[in-house]
UniProtKB/Swiss-Prot annotation:
Belongs to the bacterial ribosomal protein bL20 family. It comes from the Eukaryota. This is Large ribosomal subunit protein bL20c. GO terms for molecular function: rRNA binding; structural constituent of ribosome. Signal peptide: none annotated.
């Protein structure tokens, strides 16, 4: 059987993985086997946390809108319900930014909804 020397291809593959985990501590950045496991774990965490970030930001936006709505005397739930009944589909990210950066504008939006005729 002919001898196969993998030469630079194997070295290139290992270097790529070691470069990926270069920020790790100890053997995880030096030894190929542990580095390979660390890379797999990092990719799993990155994939999971991309979804988690979306959930966390939505929770933050809802909290901010709730605080601003309660400052005007209505809960978040009622405020969103009124928006839907007026067929104003809320973008929570934008509403949260308005609530934080320009509370007068949020109050204007809030006061333009007539709560009596809906509820």
């Amino acid at each position: 059987m002919t001898r196969v020397k993998r030469g630079y291809i194997a070295r290139k593959r290992r270097k790529k993985i070691l470069a990926f985990v270069s920020g790790s501590r100890g053997a995880h950045s030096k030894l190929f086997r542990t580095a390979n496991q660390r890379k797999a774990r990092a990719l799993v965490s990155a994939h999971r946390d991309r979804g988690k970030r979306k959930r966390d930001l939505r929770r933050l936006w809802i909290t901010r809108i709730n605080a601003a709505a309660r400052a005007n005397g209505v809960s978040y739930n009622r405020f969103i319900q009124y928006l839907y009944k007026r067929q104003l589909l809320p973008n929570r990210k934008t509403l949260a930014q308005i609530a934080v950066l320009d509370s007068n504008c949020f109050s204007t939006i809030f006061n333009n909804l007539s709560y009596d005729e809906i509820g």
